[in-house]
């Protein structure tokens, strides 16, 4: 009989393990799933140990990655293999894979997003070819296996956790970290937050219709123009709302109208396609402002950041999202709301709202 996995392995930004653990405990309880988190501070990951009668695959499907806020990656996993002998790390790994009955098309070796674990790169490189060769011979690594992927999550030279991911419910980047290149002409590094948000929230095949050069957008709290830069690069006409100065090159594009007004008060002259906002303020005040825009409605889609408190961050995020969803529901507005702690976020989360009517 095959050995069944009963752990859920999730990656996160180091320092946010407690927040991810709180989110998982809350959401599994609502889903009627039993279990508990194991997380060390600044470790960059959380192990959620499920009840013995609860298959990890069931929870993984019930709470997909796109429904989670603080997770970068979501995997079905076995408990870690520990105290691996330095002269033979492969045997225990291969034995567990064979016992699981797993088959897969690719193998990823990963570490937490910390400087200490990144030193394991040499070990992973040395193991890659012999690991692939052995698993091919044992019939686990195949050309066709439903797109499944084996993950080896190394947290020490003698400690690795084996996990599996499935297409459509995983991040397609090593460590769950997208590799975006900072455009030198952008006015600030914040530009990468909006670019990453589009990759996460808007399917690439929908970009021609939802991020097109025929659109109009508002950027609240725009200066110096990091987010406006992304809108302009897509060909949009942008109302940049901020009392601060905008980047000269952006203004020279002819696609930006800079208005020195309060982003919480300004109203657009017509319904726009996009609202984006990276204003540093109390999260609930930002929610109230976005709610007004969506109820009016002054936009079709919105992406905005919520700055988080130092403690009980999941409680604050949950409260804000519930408030927004409830307000839109009471107004009879159908919308899809998603939220993610992006790689390029720090002490904030990014929210996307798409009106469905």
UniProtKB/Swiss-Prot annotation:
It is found in: Cytoplasm. The keyword Isomerase does not apply. GO terms for molecular function: S-adenosylmethionine-dependent methyltransferase activity. It catalyses: cytidine(2498) in 23S rRNA + S-adenosyl-L-methionine = 2'-O-methylcytidine(2498) in 23S rRNA + S-adenosyl-L-homocysteine + H(+). Keywords: Cytoplasm, Methyltransferase, rRNA processing, S-adenosyl-L-methionine, Transferase. One of its GO terms (cellular component) is cytoplasm. It is an enzyme of class 2 (transferase). Its EC number is 2.1.1.186. NCBIfam families: PRK11760.1 (NF008734). Catalyzes the 2'-O-methylation at nucleotide C2498 in 23S rRNA. This is Ribosomal RNA large subunit methyltransferase M. It comes from Chromohalobacter salexigens (strain ATCC BAA-138 / DSM 3043 / CIP 106854 / NCIMB 13768 / 1H11). The gene is rlmM.
């Amino acid at each position: 009989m095959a050995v069944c996995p009963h752990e859920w392995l999730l990656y996160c930004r180091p320092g946010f393990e407690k927040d991810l653990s709180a989110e998982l405990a809350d959401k599994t309880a609502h889903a009627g799933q039993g279990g508990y988190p194991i997380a060390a501070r600044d470790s960059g990951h959380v192990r959620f140990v499920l009840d013995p009668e609860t298959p990890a695959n069931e929870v993984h499907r019930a709470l997909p990655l796109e429904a989670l806020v603080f997770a970068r990656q979501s995997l079905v996993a076995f408990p870690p293999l520990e105290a691996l002998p330095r002269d033979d790390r492969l045997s225990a790994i291969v034995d567990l894979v064979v016992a699981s009955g797993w088959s897969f098309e690719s193998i990823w070796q990963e570490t937490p997003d910390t400087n200490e674990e990144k030193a394991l790169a040499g070990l992973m490189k040395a193991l890659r070819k012999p690991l692939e060769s052995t698993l091919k011979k044992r019939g686990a690594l195949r050309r066709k296996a439903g797109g499944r992927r084996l993950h080896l999550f190394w947290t020490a030279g003698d400690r690795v956790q084996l996990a599996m991911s499935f297409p459509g419910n995983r991040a397609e980047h090593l460590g769950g970290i997208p590799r975006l290149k900072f455009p030198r002409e952008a006015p600030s590094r914040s530009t990468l937050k909006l670019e990453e948000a589009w990759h996460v929230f808007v399917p690439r095949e929908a970009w021609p219709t939802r991020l097109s050069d025929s659109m109009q957008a508002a950027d609240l709290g725009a200066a110096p123009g990091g987010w406006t830069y992304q809108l302009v690069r897509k060909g949009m006409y942008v109302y940049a709302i901020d009392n601060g100065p905008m980047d000269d090159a952006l203004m020279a594009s002819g696609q930006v109208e800079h208005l020195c007004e309060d982003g919480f008060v300004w109203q657009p002259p017509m319904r726009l396609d996009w609202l984006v906002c990276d204003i540093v303020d109390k999260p609930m005040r930002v929610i109230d402002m976005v709610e007004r825009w969506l109820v009016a409605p002054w936009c079709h889609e919105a992406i905005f950041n919520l700055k988080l408190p130092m403690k009980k961050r999941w409680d604050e995020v949950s409260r804000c999202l519930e408030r927004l969803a409830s307000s839109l529901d009471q107004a009879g507005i159908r919308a899809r709301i998603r939220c993610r702690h992006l790689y390029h976020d720090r002490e904030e989360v990014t929210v996307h709202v798409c009106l469905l009517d």
